[in-house]
A protein has these predicted regions:
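Active-site region of glycoside hydrolase catalytic domains
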Residues: 1-2
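Juxtamembrane extracytosolic/periplasmic "stalk" immediately C-terminal to the first targeting helix
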Residues: 18-20
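Carbohydrate-interacting/catalytic domains
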Residues: 8, 13-14, 23-48, 52-192
Length: 192
């Protein structure tokens, strides 16, 4: 799989990725982070077109350089920080890239919660280490949102597109999230 965000999507009057997002400027930044967080977690090789990492609102133009001056503004600097950190996170976590060419590296937990716009899936490496990915595609805080998990024990949030250092709301789920067998869901014996 190749997941391209090609130049053809951000030129010739089609708008930048930022301008394709709905909502306020803050919601546009959050939408791009959520979309690209999903892309990084999804199986397949990644291709990101230049300028997106800066949060450019203008279309890409081959006759001029990127709008590097945007990095002097806090929201754009935070967006740039997000891209740096998610790339490092991706490289450091082999379940995200080791088996990205077939179904052995991917499994759905929840793919049908269209009312909440949330999807949940698992990614695996060859040793069956795994990461659970939760994507919330709307700017609504999901308190007490439960997901089925494969193992009994403690879970922790290891990356979030909504962390304040990326310009997000700063809502964190933290660590030591204990699974509960009283609430089985999504075909799993426990949930968090």
């Amino acid at each position: 799989f190749v997941l391209p965000i090609s130049h053809d999507e951000v030129v010739h009057g089609k708008c930048s990725l930022m301008n394709k997002m709905p909502g306020t400027a803050e919601q546009k930044f959050a939408g791009v982070r959520a979309f690209l967080g999903y892309m990084m977690a999804h199986p397949g090789k990644k291709l990101l077109f230049m300028g997106t990492e800066l949060g450019q609102f203008i279309e890409w133009n081959y006759e001029q350089e990127l709008d590097w001056l945007l990095l002097q503004y806090p929201q754009h600097a935070a967006q740039h920080r997000f891209f740096k950190e998610i790339n490092h996170f991706y490289l450091e976590n082999s379940p995200l890239w080791e088996i990205d060419f077939n179904w052995d590296g991917f499994s759905w937990i929840s793919s049908d919660d269209c009312e909440q716009s949330v999807i949940v899936f698992r990614r695996f490496n060859k040793e069956k280490d795994e990461i659970i990915i939760v994507c919330n595609f709307v700017p609504v805080e999901r308190e007490q949102y439960r997901i089925g998990v494969p193992y009994d024990g403690a879970y922790e949030e290891v990356f979030s597109t909504d962390w304040s250092r990326f310009g997000g709301s700063g809502i964190e789920n933290g660590s030591n999230i204990i699974s509960e067998k009283e609430f089985p869901m999504h075909g799993m014996e426990q949930s968090i």
